[in-house]
C-alpha cells in the first residue's frame, strides 16, 4: 500500500509560520474564548500551543512559552481574563480529550 503524504507537509514553512502567528494573535485578542472552552471543543488551547512550540525546539521554559502565546505572563492573563470553569465545561473538556 503506497504511503500517502499529508498535503499540509507540502505547505511552505514561511506560509505556515504566518498562519500560526495569525492564529496566536487572533487568540490574544479573543480573551472571551476561554482555554477550557477551546479544550472542550477542539482538544487544544493556548497552553497546548505553548507546549507545541517547546516540542518544536523553542528554547524558553514553560512560562516563557506561555507568555509568548498569551501575549503576557500566564499569571497576569489568568488574573485578567480566565473565568472559573463550570462542571459542564470540565466534563466537555474531559470528553474532548478522550478523542485526542
Question: Where does each model-flagged region fall?
Answer:
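Domain-level signature for proteins that mediate thiol-based redox and metal-cofactor handling
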Residues: 2-100
Amino acid at each position: 500500500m503506497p504511503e500517502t503524504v499529508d498535503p499540509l507537509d507540502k505547505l511552505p514553512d514561511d506560509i505556515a509560520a504566518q498562519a500560526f502567528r495569525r492564529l496566536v494573535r487572533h487568540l490574544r485578542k479573543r480573551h472571551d474564548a476561554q482555554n477550557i472552552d477551546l479544550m472542550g471543543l477542539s482538544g487544544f488551547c493556548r497552553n497546548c500551543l505553548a507546549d507545541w512550540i517547546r516540542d518544536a525546539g523553542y528554547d524558553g521554559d514553560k512560562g516563557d512559552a506561555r507568555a509568548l502565546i498569551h501575549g503576557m505572563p500566564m499569571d497576569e492573563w489568568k488574573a485578567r481574563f480566565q473565568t472559573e470553569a463550570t462542571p459542564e465545561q470540565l466534563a466537555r473538556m474531559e470528553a474532548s480529550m478522550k478523542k485526542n
